[in-house]
């Protein structure tokens, strides 16, 4: 008889099963050799850190599917894993972007150590995401934008720094005069459903010395994608001359994959989904760096944050 007891974290389940010798029973039933005792020390160390954090930090996850947090399950787990590396518990605050505007953004996000603007599709809630980006940028709060979150960062910068007040993505407004986010030219004639999706893993070259390169510890990475729209490189010179840099690009196509604002404590947007590659054994370096700098921001005197 094997007990399936409640545990504080799902990551402890294999340890509980091992203590009851369930692994040996399964191997025996399958007539497989069980000569070597498994080394679960790294998993045990991870679980110990998850269960006994030295501190807690509050990070906002701004999205439009927040009524169902499992929509962001991969991001949530990435924060658990990155938190363990930093000896802290990340308390996620799910903030519905449809309910954010200029009048309440400070109330909703002002006490956060970091702000993540989540992926998604479509126009609903987009202005709230852009408002959250603006708050993070102008209040110098650590920021990570993923996929649509990165695109919102580009749109916000175009509107409020470059002065293109109608700037947006052609996903939201096909007739916009400033399509800073757009379909690639070769995609525009594709009509088959899903045909314009950029899916799977692609290489990315990072600029040496950028915050992204510092987090990864290398300039050559490969990350997974799931999106249709891209940074419009026709605007790249405008962005870079005003302080938003393209620090990651596909080496074959030149498509922009990572943007940063160097004159900010930590402002990073990725077109790809870093959460897809985060694991217990290898927490994603961007999440690890984001959590670390968010904790540093939390400990700064209030007057030093702006």
Residue ranges and their predicted role:
Residues 208-263:
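Catalytic beta-strand/loop cores that center a nucleophilic Ser/Cys/Thr
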Residues 108-203, 209-211, 280, 286-294:
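Cysteine-nucleophile active-site neighborhood
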Residues 259-282, 286-289:
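A glycine-centered loop/beta-turn motif at secondary-structure junctions
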Residues 2, 91-95, 247:
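General small-molecule cofactor/ligand-binding pocket signal
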Residues 296-302:
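Conserved small/polar residues in nucleotide/adenosyl-binding loops
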Residues 58-131:
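Phosphate-binding active sites in nucleotide-utilizing proteins
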Residues 1-58, 67-74, 104:
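Flexible inter-domain linker/hinge segments
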Residues 45-49, 188-225, 232:
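Glycine-rich phosphate/pyrophosphate-binding loop
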């Amino acid at each position: 008889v094997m007990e399936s007891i409640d545990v504080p974290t799902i990551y402890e389940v294999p340890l509980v099963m091992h203590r009851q010798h369930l692994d040996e029973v399964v191997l025996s039933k399958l007539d497989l050799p069980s000569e070597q005792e498994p080394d679960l020390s790294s998993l045990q160390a991870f679980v110990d850190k998850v269960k006994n954090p030295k501190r807690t930090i509050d990070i906002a996850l701004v999205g439009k599917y927040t009524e169902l947090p499992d929509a962001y399950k991969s991001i949530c787990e990435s924060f658990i894993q990155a938190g363990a590396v930093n000896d802290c518990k990340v308390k996620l605050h799910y903030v519905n972007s449809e309910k954010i505007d200029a009048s309440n953004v400070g109330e909703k996000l002002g006490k956060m150590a970091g702000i993540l603007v989540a992926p998604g599709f479509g126009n609903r809630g987009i202005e709230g995401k852009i408002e959250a980006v603006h708050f993070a940028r102008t209040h110098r709060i650590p920021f990570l934008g993923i996929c649509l979150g990165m695109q919102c960062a580009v749109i916000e910068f175009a509107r409020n720094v470059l002065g293109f007040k109608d700037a947006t993505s052609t996903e939201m407004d096909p007739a916009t005069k400033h399509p800073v986010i757009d379909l690639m030219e070769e995609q525009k004639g594709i009509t088959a459903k899903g045909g314009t999706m950029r899916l799977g893993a692609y290489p990315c070259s990072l600029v040496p010395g950028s915050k992204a390169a510092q987090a990864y510890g290398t300039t050559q990475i490969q990350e997974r994608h799931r999106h249709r729209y891209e940074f419009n490189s026709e605007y790249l010179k405008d962005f870079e001359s005003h302080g938003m840099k393209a620090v990651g690009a596909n080496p074959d196509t030149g498509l922009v994959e990572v943007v940063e604002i160097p004159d900010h404590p930590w402002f990073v947007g990725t077109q790809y989904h870093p959460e897809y590659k985060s694991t217990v054994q290898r927490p994603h370096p961007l999440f690890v760096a984001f959590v670390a700098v968010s904790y540093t921001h939390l400990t700064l005197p209030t007057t030093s944050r702006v």
